[in-house]
Regions:
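Conserved core segment of the aminotransferase class I/II
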Residues: 1-63
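Short amphipathic alpha-helical segments
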Residues: 12-13, 89-91, 126-128
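Short hydrophobic/aromatic beta-strand micro-patches
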Residues: 18, 94-96, 131-133
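Helix N-cap motif at beta-to-alpha junctions
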Residues: 21-22, 98-100, 135-137
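Short amphipathic alpha-helical/adjacent loop interface patches that line ligand
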Residues: 32, 69, 143
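Conserved glycine-rich beta-strand-loop-beta hairpin in the small C-terminal domain of fold type I
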Residues: 48, 63-73, 83-96
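Acidic-histidine catalytic/liganding microenvironments
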Residues: 79
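PLP-dependent enzyme catalytic core of the Aspartate aminotransferase-like
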Residues: 107-117, 122-158
Length: 158
């Protein structure tokens, strides 16, 4: 487990594993022991501060992300050829582009200034992944450009 993404301190470099199974725990310790450097003081202090005083901030973050998720779902629902999968406990949204007449939706959206993650990275052809953990103004701009890309490429005119 790690608080690094939730509290936006990825450089803190502190994570932990909770494992009741002694055999599995030993394998985990052996496996990651040489891969992960020792935690630094900053990581401990940042994590302690987040655990002791970060609940209000975390709840505000979750509320903000819910608003971004709602905006994303409603917007994609109104763009022909795109479909959203349910987002469960994540700030990453999967958009199906199967109904678009384009071989590579990633490149289509990139031409309009929206850099999404191509589904091929995850063995999901004709899909893209979008990160909603961003200022709402960025998400609004990205959705506007996605809508423009679809409209200018004949999808909305069919």
């Amino acid at each position: 487990m790690s608080l690094n993404k939730t509290f936006n301190f990825p450089g803190a470099g502190l994570a932990w594993v909770v494992c009741k199974n002694d055999i599995l725990r030993k394998k985990v310790v052996e496996g990651v022991g040489s891969l992960i450097p020792e935690a630094q003081l900053f990581g401990y202090i940042a994590t302690q501060a987040a655990l002791e005083d970060g609940e209000h901030w975390r709840l505000s973050l979750l509320s903000y992300l819910r608003g971004n998720r709602k905006l994303l779902l409603e917007s994609i629902d109104n763009i022909p050829g795109l479909h959203m999968y349910d987002m469960e406990a994540s700030y990453l949204g999967w958009i199906s582009c199967k109904d678009l007449p384009h071989k590579d939706p990633f490149k289509l959206f990139l031409r309009y200034g929206v850099a999404l993650q191509p589904g091929e990275m995850f063995n999901a052809k004709n899909h893209v992944r979008i990160n909603i953990a961003t200022p709402r103004s960025n998400l609004i701009e990205a959705l506007s450009r996605i809508n423009e890309a679809i409209g200018k490429n004949g999808i909305m005119n069919d």
